[in-house]
């Protein structure tokens, strides 16, 4: 099931651009199709993952970020339910619930930053 709610706090061109990038990024996980990632991720992208606790693993560089997100997006039997995407300028916050193959779920948030129309930073946090 594909779902999405994007709220734009600023309403300027930069926010609209960021909202479009987040829409395409969210589709990767909603549709289990990572093919768009190469066009969305900057060479110097950095992800701070949700695991391991307490600080999460750091993934640096386009290839490392695409590899991580591709693995998450294509995990069999899983799904992301998007609760909200909030955009303000070059920044976005994505609230989500991730359902694992065994039916258990976890809620979390990604703090995203875009520069030059590419994702340059993603910091993931989960409840738990």
Which residue ranges define each predicted feature?
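A general structural signal for well-ordered secondary-structure junctions
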Residues: 35, 47, 78-79
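A beta-strand edge to alpha-helix "cap/lid" segment located at domain peripheries
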Residues: 2-14, 52, 66-128
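Contiguous, function-dense segments enriched for cysteine-driven chemistry
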Residues: 62-64
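Short, low-complexity N-terminal intrinsically disordered segments enriched in polar/charged residues
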Residues: 1-43
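Alpha-helical interaction segments
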Residues: 14-19, 27, 58-60, 86-87, ...
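A short gly/proline-enriched turn/hairpin at secondary-structure junctions
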Residues: 46-58
């Amino acid at each position: 099931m594909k779902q999405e709610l994007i709220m734009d706090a600023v309403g300027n061109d930069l926010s609209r651009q960021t909202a479009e990038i987040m829409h395409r990024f969210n589709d990767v996980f909603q549709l289990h199709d990572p093919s768009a990632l190469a066009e969305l991720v900057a060479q110097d992208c950095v992800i701070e993952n949700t695991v391991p606790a307490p600080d999460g693993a750091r993934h640096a560089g386009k290839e490392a970020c695409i590899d991580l997100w591709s693995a998450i997006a294509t995990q069999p039997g899983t799904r992301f339910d998007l609760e909200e995407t909030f955009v303000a300028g070059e920044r976005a916050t994505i609230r989500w619930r991730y359902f694992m193959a065994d039916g258990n779920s976890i809620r979390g948030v990604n703090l995203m930053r875009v520069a030059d129309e590419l994702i340059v930073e993603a910091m993931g946090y989960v409840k738990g």
